[in-house]
């Protein structure tokens, strides 16, 4: 009588299951929000090599500065529209778990007499903390955002940033900077247009100006003029 075979003797050996590779930890996301006189815009992006990959974005015309020229104040309807838009931004930031962000407000909030109260309301209703930045900082941010577009052959650069309520012009001299380092020299411009490093050739701000005129303010002026002519 043949000996009894042990259980499982005819079973094929199961191949070892390959361990699933661990998912790479996502790179930290960055967000930038610009609350202007006419629009509220936000980008959420992750670093990719020497640039960024946009993960999410938001843009809406909130007309925050509508009526500001006459009253000097942000209107109730304008503030309500803006808070509604910022709630959407807050939801996107929460969805993507963004921890590194810069949220700024510009000309309309610089000029409005009730801007501080509005910024406090934004924080109270959305949890977002917006900083009202000075014209010089707005101009600096416009300049460094153009750095990747600068050709190594460029020696002088004029940056014009036309917004809803203000326009900034900045003249930069990078002729003394080695051609391959010119975009980086612009990126090194710090607050007050000062460079943080003195051991290498620097970008020089020859002159700059910020004027309280933009697309929205000019449109409002022309609308008022047309209404005056209609009433004649």
Segments (PLM) and residue ranges:
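Nucleotide/phosphate-binding catalytic cleft detector across ATP-hydrolyzing
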Residues: 1-35, 43-162, 170-224, 228
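Primarily the dimerization/phosphotransfer
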Residues: 38
């Amino acid at each position: 009588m043949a000996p009894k075979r042990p259980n499982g003797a005819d079973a094929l050996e199961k191949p070892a299951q390959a361990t699933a590779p661990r998912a790479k930890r996502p790179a930290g996301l960055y967000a930038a929000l610009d609350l202007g006189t006419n629009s509220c815009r936000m980008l959420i992006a992750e670093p990719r090599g020497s640039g960024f990959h946009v993960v999410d974005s938001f843009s809406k015309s909130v007309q925050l500065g509508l009526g500001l020229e006459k009253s000097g104040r942000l209107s109730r309807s304008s503030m309500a529209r803006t808070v509604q838009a910022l709630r959407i931004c807050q939801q996107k930031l929460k969805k993507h778990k963004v921890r590194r962000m810069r949220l700024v407000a510009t000309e309309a909030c610089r000029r409005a007499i009730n801007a501080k109260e509005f910024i406090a309301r934004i924080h109270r209703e959305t949890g977002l903390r917006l900083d009202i930045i000075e014209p010089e900082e707005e101009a600096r941010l416009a300049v460094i955002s153009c750095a990747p577009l600068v050709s190594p052959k460029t020696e002088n650069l004029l940056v014009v940033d036309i917004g809803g309520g203000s326009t900034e012009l900045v003249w930069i001299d990078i002729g003394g900077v080695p051609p391959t380092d010119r975009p980086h020299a612009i990126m090194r411009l710090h607050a007050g247009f000062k460079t943080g490093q003195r051991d290498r050739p620097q970008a020089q701000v020859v002159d700059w100006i910020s004027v309280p005129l933009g697309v929205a303010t000019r449109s409002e002026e022309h609308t008022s003029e047309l209404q005056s002519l209609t009433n004649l």
